[in-house]
């Protein structure tokens, strides 16, 4: 999944863009002259050996995190933030005194860049750095920059300097499309903060924004909070599956993979038992979002959240979800029948399918039908081989090579972080990817892409190179073998590299819309598209080799893996439709027609099909309501777009350079600087309808990978 700092009006937008040829300055010319640095090494080998960094650079100059001189020590965050805040004051004065024109947008973008360069970096360091002092300093920097952003979002003079530009039709008509869109995005961010309102309403909007931030934080913490039950209330033989604390049993998750039906049932009922405080927090969060949306001129929070997306409005989202649900219903029933059959076989006393059953039994069916034990695949997917595979694919599709570069002393936060230079065959160095791939204590468990610095065209004509981090949680190498990936780890690696390429190739003029800073329902398209490449034998065959024997991964093993993913896939997708629909209803018309739990019950029965379990409140564990409020449908829509792009542009030949260049030009190069549907149209050469999106998702469930793979020899 994708991570971007979101600071409101002048903060980073969640958006992604590709490359542009204009505006390459002296930096790129210099790089072209020395395209391959002597410090670069082949990427595959670099990931299959232990890093030598700490030994090689003992006497080198300490550079600071990501090469930022101030960040050689935690105190440097204070220096960096003070520097950014001083620069901000100067830029605000410039923006307010400059006559309206394109220069206004450039100043706003520089203002956004100076704040994001500290905030985005700090956003990453506060969760990923192993040293508490660095994490705390980064947290403080985030708070400080956040406070400044709140002030800027309520600075009337700053707002009016942009309003003067957008109110002058002649001036607006003279702006190029990208500049105009960036100006409108800045204005949109101002207005959702309520700056256009009178003083009293503006204060109310600010107060609501603060309240929403606090409620979001509280709700998020509550989604992971364990529940406990007195020991004597649980059958003795299942207690050992859970943690004990005195007279209580602690339940901290759903135990979805447990083979014992009773363990899964107990975990489901106890972990999802409603908590009154969490329920009140959710109700207040939804109500506050609705009040804020209405205050700034929207009929619902969903209308506000969907502005500028592919879907554009809640009506289109609901049409998409309802049509998808209709198309899936028969397949989902068949999946539940298949699960019921397996449950009856293993547990004849109780064969009714309950919500805690599908994840476990679909796994059992998969294992029985297809021999896809991960340990059979891991030897073919050493990390070095997978990185080499990515390198081959990117080179053939886009003319891009990945080179390992030795980081300077102090540049990385853990000695096993690798630094990659991303180099185009004719355009030179495009940016840097820091690969934080290995497990360590206190490291967050999610796989993520972080923007550390966005690309933009600087005033001197040079291009500010993008810098990103890819964070995974892979096992470390052992004495006898390099790091070996399961098929799902390999797919995740390709997924996150899709985000990274979006960042590298989104070479926009403006930082505000660079790389992955685009609408949510478009942002996952490049990453999901990479999953299709990761599941194609013609691609896998380029790199999957046994780390000891060098033997290629047999074609039938890839075929089995692909076919196994279709087991109960309709039921899995139906579950996502249910979640997305629930999200839309919660953020739709208020006051809600019922309690959040009653709405959950109705929606589950209509859009999923398995019975609601009394005295449970799954919505109180739905953490995505915070970060993806009214936009949870985005993953399904991004997958539909990626599926269409794959089938129409890459299915015949996954290494088609002309299709790769078109993909870069039409979909990656504009980031948030162009309407997402225009990018989709440019790539597909047609305007897809809701029915097209639904058909793309449903046809993926039918794809006979085995036949296709055998035909592709």
Swiss-Prot record:
Where would you find this protein in the cell? Mitochondrion matrix
UniProt-annotated catalytic positions: 496
Catalytic activity, per the record?
Release of an N-terminal octapeptide as second stage of processing of some proteins imported into the mitochondrion
Gene Ontology, cellular component aspect: mitochondrial matrix; mitochondrion
Q: Which PROSITE patterns match?
A: ZINC_PROTEASE
Q: Does the keyword Acetylation apply?
A: yes
Keyword Cell cycle found: no
Gene Ontology BP annotations: peptide metabolic process; protein processing involved in protein targeting to mitochondrion
Documented activity regulation: Activity is divalent cation-dependent. It is stimulated by manganese, magnesium or calcium ions and reversibly inhibited by zinc, cobalt and iron.
Per UniProt, the transit peptide runs over 1-35
Kindly provide the name given to this protein in its UniProt entry: Mitochondrial intermediate peptidase
- The record's disulfide annotation reads none
